[in-house]
């Protein structure tokens, strides 16, 4: 690997007893160690700690003082799948390609022969990663019999795969003269970066529609702390819970065959532990 990871098992050596992989992505604070603990706590809460390999990648920025051989990203770039910094090692890599590599290792039967399912999740900024990665990942084509799900928890924004946004109860195309970049990557599919741009739009749409995506939102997540309030973000709704509900209405209207599932955690706000360790959160991660 070309970035630090926290993991319960060696990915290169594997483990014949492991049946499930849980990849958990940190938020804007990049506290991968805390998210690693959250993932392990969640697995233990349902009695799966022995059979689950928990992996928490650490997407570093320059402020993390990365080692000379470790890639790092801008504070927004890692969330969006951008290439690593030009000031770091070469070749530059997308943050999303790091997740591809983790999935490739987990799904390799010579490493984890009993593994049958991988869950990729993130909360807040990590939730942004999870939703956009679900749309653009190429790793699923190499999974064989291993199934994949994505749990998107309380992100600030989502990826929209059409130009319409909800306005006063109806989906319309916004006035681009007022918000010219509202449909650019990472809000939409225009001006995609290197990783997302390697796929044509129709492929991205098809992947996001058919993949198993759980939209995990806390109904008390209505504050503006660390919320993206750019015009492109505000066109998705006033706060995180509202934005999640709108995204689901968007998918229902334009892609009724979608495989997104809305899962609302009552009385929980912007808390990764509150979300993941709730009954609904555990079901999103480990249920059917």
Give each language-model segment a name.
Residues 13, 97-116:
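Conserved acidic catalytic loop of the alpha/beta-hydrolase fold
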Residues 16-28:
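Short beta-strand element of the alpha/beta-hydrolase
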Residues 132-148:
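Conserved hydrolase catalytic core segment
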Residues 216, 228-229, 245-288:
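C-terminal catalytic histidine-bearing segment of alpha/beta-hydrolase fold enzymes
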Residues 28-105, 147-156, 161, 248-256, ...:
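Active-site machinery of serine-nucleophile hydrolases
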Residues 122-126, 130:
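Gly/Ala-rich beta-loop-alpha elbow adjacent to hydrolase catalytic centers
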Residues 145-253:
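The feature captures the conserved acid-bearing segment of alpha/beta-hydrolase catalytic domains
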Residues 1-13, 20-21, 98:
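A short loop-to-beta-strand scaffold at the N-terminal edge of the catalytic core in hydrolase folds
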């Amino acid at each position: 690997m070309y970035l630090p990871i926290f993991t319960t098992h060696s990915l290169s050596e594997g483990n014949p007893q492991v049946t499930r992989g849980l990849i958990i992505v940190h938020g804007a604070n990049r506290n991968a160690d805390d998210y690693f603990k959250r993932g392990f706590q969640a697995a233990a809460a349902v009695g799966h700690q022995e059979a689950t390999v928990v992996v928490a990648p650490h997407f570093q920025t320059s402020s993390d003082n990365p080692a000379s051989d470790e890639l790092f990203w801008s504070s927004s770039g890692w969330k969006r799948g951008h290439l690593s910094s030009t000031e770091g090692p070469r070749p530059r890599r997308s943050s999303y390609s790091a997740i591809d590599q983790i999935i490739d290792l987990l799904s390799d039967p010579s490493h984890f022969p009993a593994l049958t399912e991988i869950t990729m999740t993130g909360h807040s900024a990590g939730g942004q990663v999870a939703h956009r990665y679900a749309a653009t990942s190429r790793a699923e084509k190499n999974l064989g019999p291993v199934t994949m799900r994505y749990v998107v928890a309380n992100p600030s924004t989502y990826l929209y795969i059409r130009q319409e946004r909800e306005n006063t109860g109806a989906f319309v195309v916004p006035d681009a003269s007022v918000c010219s970049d509202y449909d650019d990557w990472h809000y939409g599919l225009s001006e995609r970066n290197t990783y997302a741009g390697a796929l044509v739009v129709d492929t991205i749409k098809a992947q996001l529609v058919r993949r198993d995506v759980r939209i995990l939102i806390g109904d008390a997540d209505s504050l503006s702390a660390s919320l993206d309030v750019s015009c492109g973000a505000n066109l998705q709704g006033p706060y995180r819970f509202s934005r999640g509900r709108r995204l689901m209405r968007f998918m229902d209207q334009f892609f009724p065959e979608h495989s997104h599932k809305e899962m609302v955690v009552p009385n929980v706000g912007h808390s990764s532990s509150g979300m993941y360790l709730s009954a609904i959160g555990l079901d999103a991660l480990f249920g059917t």
